[in-house]
């Protein structure tokens, strides 16, 4: 296998866009190049991923590695694509089986030492992954409680890249999986939660206008469509 696709997602305003992370490893001038309408923090993932893979006991070959985040029309922001990029590259190099990633959404930031850090926007991403037919979601251990608020999809929390790869290769002891379902505390959070502007990603100008309007009792009409 020299090519692999891993599913991920990006929060775009009030919606979630599923993203395909494609990795190709081939002969050629050694390089690690990423494309797909990327922000600066996503472009920096190439250095984080390469270092994390090396510090997790695996080696990148002296080959041409191309990573594409599709669709190219969607702007990719944040560090949540680190983990799907790493797994796509590792699967393309046969470090992990591609079959283990079928129907699995992946999100998470990766540190230089290979630890998997928490990210924002987990709840809507897991909900959309379930709606799109994903059977499981790999996410940072820090975000496990948030991910488990969504029923009907298996949550696989991970705290470092090395253990995650061992799990994907069949060592189920490497990832601690709690029983599915909501605890009473989780149910209280989910059922008693009220609408809050902090739940909305972006739309800062619209939120600010609404706050001013409420303070002055002004009626406003706003186009909430996110400009491309």
At which residue positions do the language-model features occur?
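Peripheral, non-AAA+ core regions of ATP-driven protein-machinery
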Residues: 1-217, 221-225
């Amino acid at each position: 296998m020299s090519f692999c696709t891993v599913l991920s997602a990006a929060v775009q305003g009030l919606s979630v866009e599923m993203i395909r992370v494609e990795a190709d490893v081939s002969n050629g001038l050694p390089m690690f190049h990423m494309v797909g309408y990327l922000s600066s923090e996503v472009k920096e993932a190439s250095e984080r991923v390469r270092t994390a893979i090396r510090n997790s006991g695996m080696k990148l070959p002296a080959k041409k590695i191309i990573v594409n985040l599709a669709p190219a029309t969607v702007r990719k922001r944040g560090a949540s694509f680190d983990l799907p990029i790493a797994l796509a590259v590792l699967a393309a190099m046969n470090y992990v089986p591609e079959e283990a990633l079928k129907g699995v959404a992946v999100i998470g930031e990766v540190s230089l030492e290979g630890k998997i850090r928490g990210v924002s926007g987990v709840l809507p991403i897991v909900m959309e992954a379930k709606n799109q037919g994903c059977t499981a979601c790999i996410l940072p251990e820090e975000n496990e409680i948030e991910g488990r608020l969504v029923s009907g999809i298996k949550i696989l929390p991970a705290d470092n890249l090395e253990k995650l790869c061992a799990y994907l290769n069949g060592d189920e002891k490497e990832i601690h999986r709690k029983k599915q379902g909501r605890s009473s505390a989780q149910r209280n959070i989910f059922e008693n939660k009220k609408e809050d502007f902090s739940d909305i990603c972006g739309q800062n100008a619209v939120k600010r206008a609404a706050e001013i309007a409420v303070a002055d009792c002004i009626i406003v009409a706003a186009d909430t469509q996110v400009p491309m």
